[in-house]
Amino acid sequence: MTEYKLVVVGAGGVGKSALTIQLIQNHFVDEYDPTIEDSYRKQVVIDGETCLLDILDTAGQEEYSAMRDQYMRTGEGFLLVFAVNSAKSFEDIGTYREQIKRVKDAEEVPMVLVGNKCDLPSWNVAKQYGIPYIETSAKTRMGVDDAFYTLVREIRKDKDNKGRKGRKTNKPNRRFKCKML
């Protein structure tokens, strides 16, 4: 069974945890409790293939930004989540995207733009970035599966493209140890 390491990023309060818990437990969490970092696993079938999603739900608050590089290194794909009722969270997406590309040292990384709490000019940004856009509501569960499953499909496409291009990386395989900050 293929395992996918998914990372959910975005500003504080956009609904990253609510989306993740809705996917994992079919339950909407109404109250806001800032996340430092939570990890979830779920076995799902996507396009006929059984796979294991290893999902890292990250902190959106600025005081935890030092942790970002580490989880960006280990993630295979990223849900870039903003709240459609917060222009600032939408503007922050570009910063997350650039940081992911810098840390991964790659121009193309599997990402899905997720507009949670539904309806802003986000579709055009996703088109400009060349990545899928999914509107979600963690409360009603609208688009929750689609967001995570689309990201897995993006990872598969990315692996396929890299396999076809036969690109070899000269970077050594590195293992990272946990650091206390």
Curated annotation (Swiss-Prot):
GO annotation terms (biological process): signal transduction
Topology class, membrane: Lipid-anchor
Molecular function via GO: G protein activity; GTP binding
Cellular localisation: Cell membrane
Cysteine methyl ester: modified positions: 178
Residue span(s) of the pro-peptide: 179-181
SUPFAM superfamilies in alphabetical order: P-loop containing nucleoside triphosphate hydrolases
Residues at which GTP binds: 10-17, 57-61, 116-119
Regulation: Alternates between an inactive form bound to GDP and an active form bound to GTP. Activated by a guanine nucleotide-exchange factor (GEF) and inactivated by a GTPase-activating protein (GAP).
Annotated motif Effector region, positions: 32-40
Pfam families (UniProt xref): Ras
Catalytic activity: GTP + H2O = GDP + phosphate + H(+)
Protein EC: 3.6.5.2
Domain of life: Eukaryota
Residues anchoring lipid (S-geranylgeranyl cysteine): 178
PANTHER family: RAS, DI-RAS, AND RHEB FAMILY MEMBERS OF SMALL GTPASE SUPERFAMILY
Family: Belongs to the small GTPase superfamily. Ras family.
Task of the protein: Ras proteins bind GDP/GTP and possess intrinsic GTPase activity. Plays a role in eye development by regulating cell growth, survival of postmitotic ommatidial cells and differentiation of photoreceptor cells. During larval development, mediates Ptth/tor signaling leading to the production of ecdysone, a hormone required for the initiation of metamorphosis.
Protein name, per record: Ras-like protein 1
